Amino acid sequence: NLYQFKNMIKCTVPSRSWWHFANYGCYCGRGGSGTPVDDLDRCCQTHDNCYSDAEKISGCRPYFKTYSYDCTKGKLTCKEGNNECAAFVCKCDRLAAICFAGAHYNDNNNYIDLARHCQ
């Protein structure tokens, strides 16, 4: 779920608040359209697509689904025992948080004009 995703981001990118990713580029945050502005925005596009795939699992609501995971010294692990939906959503969030950690953050791409840059 989004709360757990926020905590996964805190695990992999402890130097930056999750809030910095909430309105970044064309895909980080609500919705998403157009061409991603950079690698970090592509991480968000991939995460959005992953959640769309999760929704194809019967009854799976990725924004609200809780799952079991562990964060140890910046390393994320989705725990055994998650059901199909929880395991899928955990993987989506884990891969995105790892992607965020490896991508450059460009302050100029935070709060961009979506109508102008994301069509």
From Swiss-Prot:
The protein, known as:
Basic phospholipase A2 DE-1
GO MF annotation terms: calcium ion binding; calcium-dependent phospholipase A2 activity; phospholipid binding; signaling receptor binding; toxin activity
InterPro entries according to UniProt = PLipase_A2, PLipase_A2_Asp_AS, PLipase_A2_dom, PLipase_A2_dom_sf, PLipase_A2_His_AS
All disulfide bonds of the chain are: 11-71, 26-118, 28-44, 43-99, 50-92, 60-85, 78-90
What is the role of this chain?
PLA2 catalyzes the calcium-dependent hydrolysis of the 2-acyl groups in 3-sn-phosphoglycerides.
Q: What else is known?
A: Two forms of phospholipase A2 are found in Ringhals venom.
Its keywords, alphabetically, are:
Calcium, Disulfide bond, Hydrolase, Lipid degradation, Lipid metabolism, Metal-binding, Secreted, Toxin
Tell me its EC number(s), please.
3.1.1.4
- Class of the enzyme per the UniProt entry, highest EC level: hydrolase
Name its co-factor(s).
Ca(2+)
Give the cofactor note: Binds 1 Ca(2+) ion.
Q: Identify the Pfam families for this entry.
A: Phospholip_A2_1 (PF00068)
Q: What catalytic activity does the UniProt entry give for this protein? A: a 1,2-diacyl-sn-glycero-3-phosphocholine + H2O = a 1-acyl-sn-glycero-3-phosphocholine + a fatty acid + H(+)
Q: Where are the bilayer-spanning segments?
A: none
What's any GO biological process attached to this entry? lipid catabolic process
What positions constitute the catalytic site?
93
Which residues make up the binding site for Ca(2+)? 27, 29, 31, 48
Q: Where does this polypeptide localize?
A: Secreted
Where does this protein come from, organism-wise? Hemachatus haemachatus (Rinkhals)
Q: Which GO terms describe its cellular component?
A: extracellular region
| Family to which the UniProt record says this protein belongs | Belongs to the phospholipase A2 family. Group I subfamily. D49 sub-subfamily.
